């Protein structure tokens, strides 16, 4: 199964949310998201197992590895670029992964329109774009509204993890998460990951360039 075997199920002018070939397409610049009736997680995965979600899935190395480790845990991979979605889909097929759903679209749109409260045991954000220029910071994932939305979708005791090579991004994200979640690590609330994080393509890329990898974890407590 090759990446190019996956085709977009619509032309741009006819775009609409739809699920095909284990991919949920959430198009940009669309105004009728609520018209799509989202299936239940049980219908999508054909089981009642716990669900974890990775954002910024890239080429899918990390999430496919996680899905293969434990078939009883369902995974959702969210990636906005279709060329990368194709690579995730190809890996999923070639490794015969049955506990993975790919979302092709913006994480914020997927969460706000299609993810119900207390859906996820864990959310992992792997190497998001740091948008380092000040004028671009409005595009960062870790802003108040979206962190609140991620918190909403976690079960009590659920975990939100961020891995990044950008220290300034890390510190800013921690500042936001401290408003809504409980830190899972002692102050300064992050660790330097030496190894054993996983097979992320971006992790391997930044390590090859001599970059440090940082990881932080936050927990949704009772009453939050």
Curated annotation (Swiss-Prot):
Taxonomic source organism: Chlamydia trachomatis serovar D (strain ATCC VR-885 / DSM 19411 / UW-3/Cx)
Role noted for this protein: Catalyzes the formation of N(7)-methylguanine at position 46 (m7G46) in tRNA.
| UniProt keyword terms in alphabetical order | Methyltransferase, S-adenosyl-L-methionine, Transferase, tRNA processing
**Annotated family:** Belongs to the class I-like SAM-binding methyltransferase superfamily. TrmB family.
Q: In which pathway does it act?
A: tRNA modification; N(7)-methylguanine-tRNA biosynthesis
- Protein name per Swiss-Prot or TrEMBL: tRNA (guanine-N(7)-)-methyltransferase
Q: Where does substrate bind?
A: 133, 165
Q: Which residues bind S-adenosyl-L-methionine?
A: 54, 79, 106, 129
GO CC term, one of those recorded: tRNA methyltransferase complex
Intrachain disulfide bonds? none
Catalytic activity annotation: guanosine(46) in tRNA + S-adenosyl-L-methionine = N(7)-methylguanosine(46) in tRNA + S-adenosyl-L-homocysteine
Where would one find the signal peptide in this protein? none
Any one GO MF annotation of this record: tRNA (guanine(46)-N7)-methyltransferase activity
């Amino acid at each position: 199964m090759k990446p190019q075997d996956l085709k977009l199920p619509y032309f741009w002018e006819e775009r609409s949310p739809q699920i095909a070939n284990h991919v949920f397409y959430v198009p940009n610049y669309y105004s009728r998201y609520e018209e799509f009736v989202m299936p239940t997680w049980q219908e999508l995965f054909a089981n009642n197992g716990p669900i974890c979600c990775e954002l910024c899935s890239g080429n899918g190395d990390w999430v496919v590895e996680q899905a293969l480790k434990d078939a009883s845990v369902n995974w959702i991979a969210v990636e906005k670029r279709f060329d990368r979605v194709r690579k995730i889909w190809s890996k999923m097929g070639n490794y015969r992964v049955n506990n993975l759903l790919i979302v092709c679209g913006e994480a914020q749109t997927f969460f706000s329109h299609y993810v119900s409260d207390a859906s996820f045991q864990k959310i992992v954000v792997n190497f998001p774009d740091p948008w380092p220029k000040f004028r671009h910071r409005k595009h960062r994932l870790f802003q108040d509204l979206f962190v609140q939305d991620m918190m909403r979708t976690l079960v009590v005791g659920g975990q939100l993890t961020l891995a990044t090579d950008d220290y300034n991004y890390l510190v800013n994200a921690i500042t936001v998460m401290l408003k809504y979640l409980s830190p899972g690590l002692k102050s300064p609330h992050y660790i330097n990951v030496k190894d054993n994080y996983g097979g992320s393509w971006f992790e391997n890329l930044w390590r090859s360039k001599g970059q440090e990898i940082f990881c932080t974890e936050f927990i949704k407590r009772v009453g939050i």
